């Protein structure tokens, strides 16, 4: 597509920035405006940062909102690419960015005033390749009582993957890479490129089976290199949770189903790497011997706390939705050669080379 810098681009960056802030968005102009408003209040010189709004095909007022803020920041760029998937915005902005440190945030988070300064502090040690900060949920309405079943506690602090909450206390500390999430995903640009970029992340509902392990996949690759992940409490963001996300079990259903898709995605990539001579059908047979039906039916239960007492409705969701997602992904992997190619891409940096499946091109 016009204007895309390829992974091997020789284009000289006009200016090396300290920090590139990348916001992936689609049809959430009001939420986006709140996020950029918060960025405008950061305690940092705007000459040190650049902001990218990566629009994944919005039909609302997102372009107008972006243009308004482009007049405020000296280094601001709006990227429009309607091809489906969060991966598009992530990687388009990655190759147009000039920051030594990259901050990928969602359009429903609002960085706190000292966030940018603390982001840069997080990478003072060369041993740190990836980082995050506190993620503070802000509910539009009081959440239902059953949500407490999905808030977990460990020796680091409290967290909830479903609700995007992370509170590991007031001290800077090393953490497992699995706790660096896309709502507040901080990484060295060099490390991101060496890791091969993101795996597929969020997808529209009708293409949900094309999702992958996204941000978490990058973290695990980074960890394999020996680099460490850091939690900096000052690199905090507020995470807006609207009432429609918390008033029913629909979000839980979508999330657990997605966990099933991701479980299959990760499994098939691992099996293909370990068994490079096997065909797609053979890999499916191998998958059936690798993961048990009990493991499949328990997909998502690792995100419940030990005292969980689920309602019958939620218990049914946890018993069925993860396995449904897993089976659907396996079905597509078995019958669709182009889908297999998508899942087994070495990396997704070259978007034009990766986006060949007809379903991903039917915009």
Task: Place the predicted regions along the sequence by residue.
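Glycine-rich, basic loop-to-helix element that forms the pyrophosphate-binding segment
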Residues: 81-97
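Short aromatic/hydrophobic "clamp" motif used to bind/position activated sugar donors
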Residues: 102
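A conserved acidic beta->alpha catalytic loop
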Residues: 38, 55-64, 109
């Amino acid at each position: 597509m016009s204007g895309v810098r390829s992974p091997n681009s020789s284009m000289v960056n006009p200016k090396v920035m300290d920090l590139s802030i990348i916001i992936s968005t689609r049809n959430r102009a009001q939420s986006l405006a709140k996020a950029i408003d918060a960025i405008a209040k950061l305690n940092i010189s705007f000459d040190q940062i650049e902001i990218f709004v990566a629009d994944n095909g919005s039909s609302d007022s997102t372009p107008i909102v972006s243009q308004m803020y482009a007049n405020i920041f000296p280094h601001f760029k709006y990227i429009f690419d309607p091809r489906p998937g969060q991966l598009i915005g992530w990687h388009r902005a990655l190759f147009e960015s000039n920051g030594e440190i990259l901050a990928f945030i969602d359009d429903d988070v609002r960085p706190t005033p000292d966030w940018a300064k603390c982001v840069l502090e997080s990478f003072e040690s060369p041993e740190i390749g990836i980082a995050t900060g506190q993620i503070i949920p802000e509910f539009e309405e009081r959440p239902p009582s059953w949500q407490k079943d999905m808030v977990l506690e460990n020796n680091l602090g409290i967290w909830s993957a479903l609700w995007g909450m992370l509170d590991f206390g007031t001290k800077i500390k090393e953490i497992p890479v699995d706790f660096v999430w896309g709502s507040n995903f901080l990484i060295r640009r060099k490390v991101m490129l060496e890791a091969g970029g993101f795996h597929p992340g969020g997808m529209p509902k009708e293409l949900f089976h094309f999702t992958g392990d996204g941000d978490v996949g990058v973290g695990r690759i980074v960890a394999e290199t020996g680099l460490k992940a850091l939690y900096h409490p000052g690199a905090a963001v507020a995470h807006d949770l609207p009432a429609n996300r918390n008033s029913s079990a629909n979000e839980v259903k979508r999330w657990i189903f997605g966990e099933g898709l991701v479980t299959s995605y990760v499994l098939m990539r691992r099996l293909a790497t370990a068994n490079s001579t096997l065909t797609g059908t053979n890999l499916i047979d191998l998958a059936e011997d690798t993961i048990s039906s009990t493991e499949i039916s328990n997909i998502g239960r690792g995100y419940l706390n030990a005292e969980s007492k689920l309602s019958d409705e939620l218990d049914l969701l946890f018993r069925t939705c993860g396995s449904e997602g897993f089976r659907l992904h396996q079905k597509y992997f078995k019958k669709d050669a182009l889908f297999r190619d998508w899942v087994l891409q070495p990396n997704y940096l070259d978007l034009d080379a990766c986006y060949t499946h007809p379903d991903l091109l039917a915009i």
